[in-house]
């Protein structure tokens, strides 16, 4: 029998309420739903809190306001507030694939020595000449295959 692990999703955000809606909506579509979602608002002046609370009927969601600015501090705040056996992190401008959490959980179930997993990133909202466009054209296939040239 497989061990049941709890999964918390940590989301750090700052003044991107509109993008946060898409990220949180993607968590509602997970084939393996999150046990909790911890959203750390890193000092937003927009309607971030309202967006988070609007998902409380679909997700077990916790809003945490963190006035000390900075991604590392905000991530640590999310980790301190998470209760899951596994803590998955997603940025506020990301949309998770429907199987994202299911795929994250599998290695932890198969091997109790696993500590960290990662996955592929698919970019959207990419503008011509952007860093993301360069990465997609030149780097992403190398990372996925381990190719060096």
What are these regions (language model features)?
Residues 1-28:
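N-proximal low-complexity "stem/linker" segments adjacent to membrane-targeting elements
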Residues 99-132:
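Conserved donor NDP-sugar-binding/catalytic core segment of glycosyltransferases
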Residues 66-82:
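Glycine-rich, basic loop-to-helix element that forms the pyrophosphate-binding segment
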Residues 87:
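Short aromatic/hydrophobic "clamp" motif used to bind/position activated sugar donors
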Residues 35-43, 64-67:
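Short beta-strand/loop segment that forms part of the nucleotide-sugar
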Residues 21, 46-54, 99:
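Acidic helix N-cap motif at the loop->helix transition within catalytic regions
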């Amino acid at each position: 029998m497989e061990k049941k692990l709890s999964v918390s999703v940590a989301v750090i955000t700052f003044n991107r309420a509109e993008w946060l809606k898409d990220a949180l909506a993607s968590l509602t579509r997970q084939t393996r739903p999150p046990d909790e979602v911890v959203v750390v608002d890193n000092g937003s002046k927009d309607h971030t809190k309202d967006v988070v609370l609007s998902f409380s009927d679909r997700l077990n969601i916790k809003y945490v306001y963190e006035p000390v600015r900075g991604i590392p501090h905000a991530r640590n705040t999310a980790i301190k507030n998470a209760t899951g056996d596994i803590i998955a992190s997603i940025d506020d401008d990301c949309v998770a694939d429907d199987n994202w959490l299911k795929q994250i959980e599998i290695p932890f179930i198969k091997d109790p020595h696993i500590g960290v997993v990662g996955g592929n990133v698919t970019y959207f909202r990419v503008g011509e000449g952007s860093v993301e466009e360069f990465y997609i054209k030149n780097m992403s296939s190398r990372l996925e295959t381990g190719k060096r040239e």
